[in-house]
Design a protein with these regions (language model features):
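Mobile amphipathic helical/loop "lid" adjacent to a hydrophobic cofactor/ligand pocket
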Residues: 66-70, 74, 79-179, 194-195, ...
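Glycine-rich FAD pyrophosphate-binding loop
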Residues: 26-50
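Conserved beta-strand segments of alpha/beta enzyme cores
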Residues: 31, 54, 79, 219-221
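Catalytic P-loop NTPase motifs of RecA-like helicase/translocase cores
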Residues: 19, 41-42, 229
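N-terminal glycine-rich dinucleotide-binding loop that anchors FAD/FMN and/or NAD(P) in oxidoreductases
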Residues: 47-72
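N-terminal Rossmann-like FAD-binding beta1-loop-alpha1 element of flavoenzymes
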Residues: 4-34
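Helical element adjacent to the flavin cofactor pocket in flavoenzyme catalytic cores
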Residues: 185-233
Length: 235
């Protein structure tokens, strides 16, 4: 099927945002086409098969509590492989294990005895978890406008616990360890980690964009680079 000469909407890029937008427009009966210069859909969510192994490009993980993810995808069909909630923390001398006793009660003794932070720090994590889960997800954005670092200090966490647990953990989420990211995002992501699982599709992260793209069929054009955009045309 050739690229249409006329259409209501041209979406440039077949990553998750472009595909989700296309599905919404398709549901409303709007003519559209999705163009992407790559050889497959997915954007940054791509997987390769190498010598019988499926390798995701970069660090990839899905949080099953994402509301838009649940609206846009059939998670059961992805055969998600779920990680046990918790973390291993290197203290400089040994690995310490912190688990989620709310979902895995057997993790409670190990988490309490872990030489990471204080008992008060761990109680504050539990209280923060329960407070965030007791509210709708969007209320995470209603709090004060300050940095995540300031938020953690306002919550009463010790500097040692912030450095040992929150900086490495959130540094991987925010891609910055100074924790200058908005506290609203911290509250939202922390709630997502507490409310659902971290998981990966059994056949690679690319299965997610492929699944979202399936109903679009030939409306998605890969190997199609966009060279210019104007008010009247996309070429």
């Amino acid at each position: 099927m050739e690229i249409p000469q006329r259409t209501d909407v041209v979406i440039v890029g077949a990553g998750l945002s472009g595909l989700a937008c296309a599905r919404l427009l398709q549901a409303e009966g709007i003519d559209l086409v999705v163009l992407d210069s790559s050889d497959a859909v997915g954007g940054r969510m791509r997987s390769d098969q190498v010598e019988g192994f499926i390798l995701d490009r970069g660090f990839q993980v899905l949080l099953t509590a994402y509301e838009e993810l649940n609206r846009s995808a059939n998670l059961n069909a992805l055969d998600l492989q779920r990680f046990k909630p918790g973390s291993l923390i290197w203290t400089g001398k040994r690995l310490e294990r912190l688990g989620d006793p709310f979902r895995n009660p057997t993790a409670l003794p190990t988490s309490i005895l872990a030489r990471v932070g204080t008992i008060e720090d761990k109680l504050r994590v539990a209280l923060l978890r329960q407070r965030l889960l007791s509210r709708p997800a969007q209320m995470a954005f209603d709090g004060p406008d300050r940095t995540t670092e300031d938020e953690l200090r306002q919550e009463g966490f010790s500097e040692a616990f912030i450095d040992q647990f929150f900086r490495p953990f959130l540094g991987g989420v925010f891609l910055e360890r100074d924790l200058k990211t908005s506290a609203s995002l911290f509250r939202y992501y922390f709630r997502c980690f507490a409310a659902g699982d971290a998981a990966v599709p059994a056949f690679g992260i690319q299965r997610l964009p492929e699944q979202i793209a399936e109903p679009l069929g030939a409306l998605v054009k890969v190997n199609t680079a966009v060279r210019s955009i104007s008010n009247e045309a996309v070429t």
